[in-house]
Amino acid sequence: MKKVLIIFIYLFLISVNTHAEEKQSSSNNLFEIGDVIISPGETYRGNLKVSKVNDAIESFIPITVHHGANPGPVLSLIAGIHGSEYSPILAMQEFAKLIDPSQLNGTVIIVHIANIPAFAARTIYIGPNDLKNLNRSFPGKVNGTITERIAYI
C-alpha cells in the first residue's frame, strides 16, 4: 500500500488539464467543478450532472474531489471509461479513502465510473445509447451525444 501511495505522490506532481478551475477569493481558494464548489481542506463526494440529450437520455458521473488545504496542481484519476473495467473502479474507491485533504497540496479529482450508461448496460467498449466509445470521444462536445457530453465534462 505504501508503494501505491508513493506512486500517486509522484503522479501528483503532474498537472492535468480539466474543465475544473480554482476560483480565487480574497480569503481562500475555492475549487469549482461542474456546479460544485469546494473549500480548501474539504472533500466532496457526489455526482456531476451530464446534460440531457433530446430531453430523454441523461446521465451522471460519480466523483470524489479532495481539495487540499494548500494550493497546488490538479490530478484527475479516471476509472470506468469502458463499462466492463471493474478493477480500476474498485481501486479508485479504495484510493479515495486514503487521502486527507487537510494534508494535501493541490486537488485530486477521482472519477469512480466515467461511463455510467456503458457500466449499467455491461457493454465492453461502446455506450448503449449512441454506440460510441468514450475512450475515442475526447475532448467531447457540449451539445453532442451522451458519450460526447460525458467526454466534454
Question: What do these predicted ranges mean?
Answer:
Residues V4-L13:
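Sec-dependent N-terminal signal peptides
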Residues A20-I153:
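Structured catalytic-domain cores with a bias toward divalent-metal coordination
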Residues S15-N17:
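N-terminal signal peptide c-region/cleavage motif recognized by signal peptidases
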